[in-house]
Amino acid sequence: MRHPRDVLFAGEKPFPILPAVDHYAGSEKLMRKALQLQQELGPIFDITCDCEDGAHAGAEREHAEMAAAVIMSDDNRFNRVGARVHDVTHAHWRQDMEILVGRAGSRLPFITLPKPCSAADVQVQIDTLRQIERQCGLDREIPVHVLIETHGALREVWQIAALPGVESLDFGLMDFVSGHHGAIPGAAMKSPGQFEHPLVARAKCEIAAAALACGVVPAHNVTTELKDLDYIRNDALRARREFGFLRMWSIHPNQIVPIVEAMRP
């Protein structure tokens, strides 16, 4: 009897092996708390230090420096602490990269790029990242995670997924719905609407299909529920079973374990 792996089409590019949860933390207090939890549970989830929404206006440099220090700290035992930089239209995105790569590049598992409006936007930031890596003498290329949360990014999601260096496509539900200026109701930002509204479901299908075809990990948006573990688990189950997402964001420690349980094969 031949094993199924010997006769079934194996696909093209294999997926990167990533933890099932990407946990976002915007302040140093929350970053440290997440690191403590990661030490207790093990590297079953990534931590992303948020230098976009987490940084106060005028304090972007200090915030990026703080995030780099957290990444380089002894508390980071598993080297699974990444960072999200500002978007390509923001004045500080290059500075974010220079600080993060210059101070913590050797331990950065990924950098997340928010709000691109095209594949060209993503390419600009990847090219700059590679240039900074060379300037810093880094002997590796840091993987990139790309947020799909604009009309333009969704339109070019297949091109984005195929860009060298892209490791994950992340759906930004809130900004995507907001970008429709009321045409999609607010109820589509939470369950069950986020799985049932045709325009949102279409976006999730496009992102997952492009990612899976290109050997990239599709990451689902956060759930707004923070306390009801069954609700959280069900959101993750629907993302995994109905839409093919292999990873999901969390914004509260309570969300991590239910998502991990739901994302298991």
Q: Whereabouts are the PLM-identified features?
A:
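Expand to "…catalyze enediolate/carbanion chemistry for C-C bond making/breaking, isomerization
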Residues: 1-265
